[in-house]
């Protein structure tokens, strides 16, 4: 079971800012994933991602589909300066998160609740209020 504390520890090891109560889990839309060049290329085969929103940018960490643990080699940080827009589009049972940059657009399906991540639902509500 993934805990938000694990995301904090992961980002601290990489010297990336972490914002409490601002982590969610998203599922990638491979057909729209045009940003992936270089360091995140290995993450294309993965489906679930932990996403943390902070004042300095957005951290995206691949999750192992079997264990649910954070993957070291599947990491991308998009700095605040690179982000053109961030928006959540409400769908019937979920949201679609779109992060637009000059390099392309990242799109994730974000469910309202996530099994094994009890913190996800409350954090999603907090993030939706702040955007």
Give a label for each model feature.
Residues 8, 124-125:
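Short amphipathic alpha-helical segments and helix-helix/interface helices
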Residues 20, 27, 53, 80, ...:
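Surface-exposed beta-strand edges and flanking loops
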Residues 1-55:
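Anionic N-terminal interaction surfaces
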Residues 39-50, 55-98:
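Phosphoinositide-binding peripheral membrane targeting modules
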Residues 103-122:
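Canonical phosphoinositide-binding patch of PH/PH-like domains
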Residues 31-32, 56, 81, 91, ...:
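Generic structural motif
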Residues 125-131:
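A membrane-cytosol interface segment of integral membrane proteins
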